[in-house]
Structures are given as structure tokens and as C-alpha cells.
Amino acid sequence: MAAKEKISRREHILQCLAQMLETNPGQRITTAKLAAEVGVSEAALYRHFPSKARMFEGLIEFIEDSLLSRINLIMDDEKDTMRRCQLVLQLLLLFAERNPGISRVLNGDALLGENERLRSRVSALFGKIETQLKQILREKTLREGKGFELDEAMLANLLLAVAEGRIAQYIRSEFKQKPTEHFDEQWGFIQKQLLQS
């Protein structure tokens, strides 16, 4: 029973942190403010997380688990190259849209002034997503014998940059300009250009 309560409190702390990141854009979250939001003392926060960095790591673990597991499902369920790319980008954009506070962690905005390893971990996550996109694009060349005009690594970088740009706009607009807005039309254009190359 005690373990269940502990997990529940940890999750509650992370949910409050994500909520504060959403409702206080551009502001740094202190442990004092977070403790007040959770309704506990700062000491109680530290019983569940040894540091504020560990709290952010908890959010990053949630991001990694959510995105990477779903990307694996996309890879298993879908075989078409362009559809795979579309679904991976759409997943990233929808995840950011549905988790506005957490999108600030993805963007790095919420990590300014925090431990460098947090930014490195988010950067590594984007590196994994870019590698996955590159692999998807390379498989098209192997399957069909025809590649793209640009190197797959450059294309993967470009596709991920589009998604990262949409997330940055979402944060800059204080969550008003949805990252998925017009994505289907924009993807249609991008896909057409890729297939013509």
C-alpha cells in the first residue's frame, strides 16, 4: 500500500510540474512554488525526488516512453515510407499539443538554467527520432531501388526541423497556435516534393 501511495504522490508532483509549465510560460519553476502547488512542503518533494533535476528527468522519461513506444508501433503497423514519416511527425506534434507544459521541456525552454544533462537527454531523444526518420527514408531506397535527391540524413534533419519549428511556434504563441494546425496540407506538399525528387 505504501508503495502505491508513493507512486501516486510522485505522479501527482510530475502532473503539477507539467501544469505549472503550461500555466506559467516563460517563468522558472522553483521547488517552493511547486511544493505550494502540490500542497506539500519542499522537504516532502525531496522525499520523492532527490533534486529538481530528477523531477524534470521524470517528465523526460514520460516523454521518451510515450514517443519511442508509439514510434515502434508505427514501424510495426505501417510499411509505406511516406506514411511512416507522416505518422512519426504527427505523433510528435500531437504529443506536444496535448501536453503543452511538457512541450516546453521538449523545446528546451523549461530547461534554461537547469542541469545540463537534462538538455542533453532531450537532445538525445531528438537524435533518436531523427535516426528513426533517416532509417525510414533509407529503407525506401533499399526496397524500391530509388532514393531521394537529397541524402536521407539531410531529409530526416529537415523533417524533424519542421516539427521542432511547429513546437517552437506553439510555445511562442503561449499554446494558441496548435502544432497540428494545417499539418495535413503541409505534409501533402512536403510529400509531393519528396516524391518528385
UniProtKB/Swiss-Prot annotation:
The protein's GO terms of the molecular function aspect are: sequence-specific DNA binding
Gene3D superfamilies under this entry? Tetracycline Repressor, domain 2 (1.10.357.10)
Looking at the record, the residues that make up the HTH tetR-type domain are 7-67
Question: Which part of the chain engages DNA, per the record?
Answer: 30-49
Q: Name one GO cellular component term.
A: cytoplasm
Cite the entry's keywords alphabetically.
Answer: Cell cycle, Cell division, Cytoplasm, DNA-binding
Task: Give me any GO biological process, just one.
Answer: negative regulation of division septum assembly
Disulfide linkages recorded for this protein, renumbered to the chain, are none
Quote the SUPFAM superfamilies the UniProt record gives: Homeodomain-like
Q: What is its main location?
A: cytoplasm
Where in the cell? Cytoplasm, Nucleoid
Assembly description: Homodimer. Interacts with FtsZ.
PANTHER family associated with the record: ACREF/ENVCD OPERON REPRESSOR-RELATED, ACREF_ENVCD OPERON REPRESSOR-RELATED
Protein function: Required for nucleoid occlusion (NO) phenomenon, which prevents Z-ring formation and cell division over the nucleoid. Acts as a DNA-associated cell division inhibitor that binds simultaneously chromosomal DNA and FtsZ, and disrupts the assembly of FtsZ polymers. SlmA-DNA-binding sequences (SBS) are dispersed on non-Ter regions of the chromosome, preventing FtsZ polymerization at these regions.
What family, per the record? Belongs to the nucleoid occlusion factor SlmA family.
Report the protein name in the record.
Answer: Nucleoid occlusion factor SlmA
Record the organism.
Answer: Shewanella amazonensis (strain ATCC BAA-1098 / SB2B)
Name of the gene this protein is made from: slmA
